[in-house]
Amino acid sequence: MTQPNEFKHISVLLDECIEALAIKPNGIYIDATFGRGGHSAHILDALGEKGRLIAFDRDPQAIKAAERFADDKRFSIIHSPFGDMAEEIEALGLTGKIDGVLMDLGVSSPQLDDAERGFSFLRDGPLDMRMDTSRGQSAADWLASAEEQDITQVIKEFGEEKFGKRIAHAIVNTRKDTPITRTAQLAKIIDEAVPVKDKFKHPATRAFQGIRIYINAELEQLRVGLKAATQVLAKEGRLAVISFHSLEDRLVKRFIKDQSKGKVVPHNLPITQAEIDADKVLKALGKAIKPSEQEIANNVRSRSSVLRVAEKL
């Protein structure tokens, strides 16, 4: 099996993230998606001797990669998804004391590039797709038993694939005779099922995305993680979230907007502005930030990234 450190990962919107977090030398920060530690390394560079960085990741290979920071007493990592952030930070006695939370969503380059992880339709490997390979159901196991209607819904809803019904039907027809266990096998089934090809995207792009999001409960994790971030952040603490597709970005944008609203009251009710504002949790900072043309030229995978930043009130 190919080792994870053979795959290079370039952190996206790196300088923009560090600026967004407005790092205090002695602050306490969370890298909610450690990956291969690119953002963590730069946060540590910005921290002073008394600063602290707590990282989260559910990928065992990411936990292994974090060993490079083992000698830095300011750093610690928790092998859990960021959906567990509220409970883990409460256990450390740090709820309401975190100065910044960074979330870099989606799949990392090492996960995509390692065929054995089963995320890529361009590299043949076991059809796995789990962020944490030590638990949960693989994509192959789910596709072997899922109802056609459920497969359709997942591919349409999470993959935003208009040919979801055709693809699901092809999957169910194929598995009657042959187990679907390889990424190349699934990609071929999808390719043959999609009647109209997008010249800018591989036919399997959206379906693979949808299945991956479902297998890892990514959107539910994001909802829980965003709420957890507001719970652990100190007043004026920063939340910075990088998303890579419209489902994630819409969810993040809506969350920040909803948390920035005050109390909703009838128009003629005698209530002060202070009482209305009391329910506000976050304040959006600036507009969505996208990578520069230079960054996209250096790292094509950054092209769809969007950074949104908010501050705890």
UniProtKB/Swiss-Prot annotation:
Its main location: cytoplasm. One of its GO terms (molecular function) is rRNA (cytosine-N4-)-methyltransferase activity. Disulfide bonds: none annotated. It catalyses: cytidine(1402) in 16S rRNA + S-adenosyl-L-methionine = N(4)-methylcytidine(1402) in 16S rRNA + S-adenosyl-L-homocysteine + H(+). It is found in: Cytoplasm. HAMAP family: 16SrRNA_methyltr_H. This is Ribosomal RNA small subunit methyltransferase H.
